[in-house]
Regions:
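Short linear interaction motifs
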Residues: 4-5, 73, 320-323
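Local cysteine-cluster metal-coordination motifs and their immediate loop/turn environment
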Residues: 11-29, 62-98, 111-118
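Short, charged/polar micro-motifs that form catalytic or ligand-binding hotspots
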Residues: 14, 82, 146, 150, ...
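Membrane helical hairpin/interfacial module
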Residues: 27-74
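Hydrophobic, aromatic-lined core segments that form the binding pocket/scaffold
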Residues: 171-400
Length: 400
């Protein structure tokens, strides 16, 4: 069995009571079968509490006011204190370690939803790289595992990460290339022409970011603008208006995990969008200027944006071996990162043009919790990338 993890993985150590939040609230923690059996046979004074606060039908810990039943007033776990750490379920034992499973391979990451893991990721200045180690385990076989597609995904992911980490190229062009590669990869899979992808991928690799590549992108954007050539349509397709539509598409579809999340989004985004509801008004210049001002005032974002993109691509891209949704996963990586940037700028404006690493950490882990702590949200977000025209290839090129 091979195990892959990012180079900063072993820097993590839980900071317990010093953590600004708790990992035991706002999501339902599923108990694995092995731990469930241990709970069934547990003896001692804690037995009744253990049995009463587990939903045995759903295999989850009960919640009270969105908090795990075993989370006490000091934000510590009563299972840990009363029964010992060996009684943790797999999720609680592993978190914030996240594991993606493939035949003969486990890919481990630190979840962005953990404040300390977010701090470690966002503090990385060097390009992240990944370490693979081998461990002798029983051989496993996954039924219907498409190893040909998986190999293509792995090779392409390496290419995508190289694109993201090419600091000699402006981020806008890196994002364009990222989307273009994923778009063409998806076309090959849709046409059952995966055998052509290696040659196409090599062409993408060789084409670089020169005039030919940029002209193709501009022609794609311009063709879409001509198609929507009325004044109202043109104004509605500015980056500001596109982002507004994207938020309005995503937010109502998401399960709210923590009370106040939607209010938080409104408070963050209103200063950026200036409360302007008229798509034909001249607010675009102010919007662009505010974003440029933030980027100048908080230069760390340049590298943090890169680290976030690598995080999303590393964690989710190769999962397309199970559902073929290659382009949707790359779209999700881009949209999530750009959504975080919008929240950054709104927070910067709301806080009288002040923004620190702590603000960045808070935005990232709160955003991640609402998305990654719910399979429903994660799956729906990805579905929206494929289903809704607002997330078309052309629209994403415009907001990069």
């Amino acid at each position: 069995m091979q195990y892959t993890f990012p180079n900063y993985y072993k820097e993590f150590s839980c900071i317990a009571g010093a953590c600004p939040d708790t990992c035991c609230a706002g999501w339902q923690i599923v108990i694995d079968d092995q731990t469930l059996k241990k709970y069934q046979h547990f003896k001692g004074p804690f037995r009744n509490r253990l049995h009463n606060d587990i939903d045995w039908k759903e295999h989850v810990f009960r919640q009270y006011n969105r908090r795990c039943a075993f989370l006490n007033e000091e934000n510590l776990c009563d299972i840990y204190t009363e029964a010992g750490p060996e009684m943790f379920c797999r999720t609680c034992r592993n978190y914030p370690r996240h594991i993606e499973e493939f035949e003969g391979l486990r890919e481990i990451s630190l979840s962005l939803s953990c404040p300390e893991a977010a701090r470690i990721l966002l503090s990385q200045k060097e390009k992240v790289h990944f370490i693979t180690k081998e461990k002798k385990t029983k051989e496993e076989v996954y039924d219907d595992f498409d190893y040909f597609l998986f190999t293509a995904l792995m090779d392409t992911r390496d290419m995508l990460i190289d694109i993201i980490q090419d600091r000699a190229v402006p981020m806008q062009k890196r994002l364009w290339k990222l989307l273009a590669v994923a778009h063409d990869f998806q076309l090959c899979v849709n046409k059952n022409e995966l055998f052509k992808w290696e040659e196409m991928r090599k062409r993408h690799e060789d084409s670089g970011y020169g005039d030919r590549f940029c002209n193709k992108i501009y022609s794609r954007i311009n063709a879409d603008n001509i198609e929507n050539s009325s004044a109202a349509s043109a104004c509605a397709n500015t980056p500001e208006q596109l982002f507004k539509k994207m938020w309005k598409t995503v937010v109502p579809e998401m399960e709210v995990l923590r009370p106040g999340w939607q209010e938080y989004l409104k408070n963050c985004l209103t200063p950026l969008y200036n409360g302007n509801t008229d798509p034909q008004s001249d607010s675009g210049n102010l919007y662009s200027w505010q974003k440029s001002e933030f980027d100048f005032s908080y230069p760390d974002w340049q590298i943090q944006e890169e680290q976030l993109l690598v995080y999303w691509i590393y964690t989710y891209f190769c999962g397309a071996v199970y559902d073929d949704e290659i382009f949707a996963k790359v779209k999700m990586a881009v949209v999530c990162t750009l959504f975080i940037h919008e929240l950054n700028v709104g927070t910067y404006l709301k806080n009288n043009r002040q923004f620190k690493l702590d603000d960045q950490i808070r935005i990232c882990y709160q955003f991640s919790r609402e998305l990654e702590h719910s399979d429903l949200n994660l799956n729906r977000f990805e579905e929206l990338m494929s289903e809704k025209e607002i997330f078309s290839f052309e629209n994403l090129l415009k907001i990069c």
